[in-house]
Amino acid sequence: VLVGTSNSASRDDEAKNYNFEGFLKEYLSVDILNYALPGADQDGSLIQYLHSSDYDPKAPPKLIVWELPANFSLEAPLTYRQLIPAINGGCAHSPEVLASASRDLPELKTAQRIELLSNTGRQRQDLQDLNRAFLEIKISDSKVKDFYIITYYDNGSRDKVWYRREGVVDGGLYYLELSQAPEHRGANLMSVFMEPVKALETPTTVEVQLCR
């Protein structure tokens, strides 16, 4: 499987600058499933592949070639907090669903927050120090690609993550591994909020699960 940027993407001959896919096919003597996308940023095409029906976590590819320009950084924690749950197959392949909720979102203004998941009151669970736990978020309107997910803990700390998916990459499904930052250790997860960067002009439905 080949993922990457416009340098590796399948294009018409007139627009093609390189033939990396053809080079791999010729010298490896294998067929190549090319998911590289122009304008998908550094991990967009890999996310596109992992979320597709071509990827099976029970029968993963023997090799993924991930082409990246030298100026792209692989140090951003959010990259791996999204990729690891996707590689493992999400909640469908998770042994335990800790919490779940579905919310019908009304029209929302920019920076207006809405709670997706609550862990308070009589139904409060012990959701502290969850190793490899992650959120699976499904948004019915696949055009919603620019928003924050904010996780609050009972010690006052919070984890605010910005999702900004490029237009060429499909929306609708998002993963977020819970933060392992020191400030959240020993704290119980209280709630998960969504905050759109751009106004939501039409109602949409969001389903969220906490799995591990």
Where do the protein language model's features map onto the residues?
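Extracellular glycan-modifying ectodomains
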Residues: V1-R212
